[in-house]
Regions:
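Single-stranded RNA-binding regions, centering on S1/OB-family and related RNA-binding modules
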Residues: 1-285
Length: 285
C-alpha cells in the first residue's frame, strides 16, 4: 500500500462510528460522509492515506487534489519552520506545502483560511506533499472558463495563485486569469489571498488586468471634486483659471486658497482627469 493511492477497500466491520476495512489483508479505517451507507462485505473505492496518528485510512470521498489532479486546499496551519498545512477534505490529515515551494519572504505566505490550488506528490519515503499549480496546470486541469463576458470597471474576485516580480497572478471565481500590478494595490497581497478588484483592462493571453485602488473619481478630495464639477458644467468643458490666476480670482470662484487650489488641480492632473493649457483647465478627452 502507498500513500495517495486510489484503491478498493472491503468493509469488514462497522461498530458505532468506527468502520474497519481490508486492503491487501491489512486492516484500515474507512471514512465516509455517511457511514450508514456502508455495508459489511461490500467493496468501495477510496483514497488511501496515513492519518496524523500514523494509521492507514481509506476515505470513500476521493479528494479533488490527488496524485494526478489539482484541487483547492484551505490553509489550516502556518508553520514558519516547515511551510503551510492545507486541508483537501480528509477528516484527520492535512497536507504540507513545503517552505521550499513558498515565497522567500514569509509575509508573502498564505495565511490561515486562505486557499491554494494543489496537487499531491509522493516522495521516496511515502510522504505526501502539496505542490502549487502553474498556469499550465490550471489550463490542463479544467480550471479555466470563457463563459463569462467581462466588462471594464466590473468588480471581480479570486485567489492569488502566483507572485511575480512586478505583481500577482489571480484565478478569478469565473475561471479566468487576472493580473494585479504592484502599482494597483495599496498594501501587500500574499499567496492564497482572496481579493476583490476592479477590471481596468484586458491584457495578452486572455488575462484580465485588475486594480484594488478606487477609480480616479472616487479618490479625489472635496476641493478637487468641486473644481472638476465646475469644469464639466461649463459649456465648452474648460475653465479660465490656472496656477497663474490670482488668489482673489480663485477665492471668488471657489472660496478656497490658492495653495488649496494648486493642490487640488495637481491631483486632477495626476489622475489624468484634466489638462492645463494656455491658462485654461480642460476635461481630458
Amino acid at each position: 500500500m502507498k500513500n495517495g493511492e486510489i484503491l478498493e477497500v472491503t468493509v469488514k466491520e462497522i461498530k458505532d462510528n468506527t468502520v474497519i476495512g481490508l486492503v491487501d489483508e491489512q486492516n484500515v479505517y474507512v471514512r465516509a460522509k455517511d457511514i450508514s451507507l456502508l455495508e459489511p462485505e461490500k467493496k468501495y473505492f477510496g483514497f488511501l492515506y496515513l492519518n496524523r496518528h500514523g494509521e492507514w485510512c481509506v476515505d470513500t470521498t476521493i479528494p479533488k487534489a490527488s496524485l494526478k489532479s489539482f484541487g483547492w486546499g484551505k490553509v489550516e496551519t502556518v508553520d514558519h519552520s516547515s511551510g503551510v498545512f492545507v486541508s483537501i477534505g480528509l477528516a484527520d490529515k492535512d497536507i504540507l506545502v513545503s517552505l521550499d515551494d513558498l515565497p522567500d519572504n514569509s509575509r508573502d505566505w498564505p495565511q490561515v483560511d486562505d486557499e491554494l490550488i494543489v496537487r499531491l506528490e509522493r516522495d521516496n519515503k511515502d510522504r505526501l506533499w502539496g505542490k502549487l499549480a502553474t498556469d499550465e496546470d490550471l489550463i490542463s486541469g479544467g480550471f479555466i472558463s470563457f463563459d463569462h463576458k467581462f466588462k471594464q470597471n466590473e468588480m471581480v474576485s479570486g485567489h492569488v495563485y502566483h507572485l511575480g516580480k512586478t505583481g500577482v497572478f489571480i484565478l478569478l471565481k469565473e475561471g479566468r486569469f487576472a493580473y494585479l500590478h504592484h502599482t494597483e494595490m495599496e498594501e501587500n497581497v500574499h499567496l492564497g489571498q482572496e481579493i476583490t478588484g476592479r477590471i481596468i483592462g484586458f491584457g495578452a493571453h486572455d488575462r484580465i488586468n485588475i486594480s484594488l485602488l478606487k477609480n480616479a473619481y472616487a479618490r479625489i478630495d472635496d476641493d478637487a471634486a468641486m473644481i472638476l464639477a465646475a469644469i464639466k458644467f461649463t459649456p465648452d468643458k474648460k475653465l479660465l483659471l490656472s496656477d497663474s490666476s490670482t488668489p482673489k480670482e480663485i477665492k471668488d470662484k471657489f472660496g478656497i486658497s490658492k495653495s488649496s487650489f494648486k493642490r487640488a488641480v495637481g491631483h486632477l492632473l495626476k489622475q489624468n482627469l484634466i489638462t492645463s493649457e494656455n491658462g485654461y483647465l480642460k476635461i481630458k478627452s
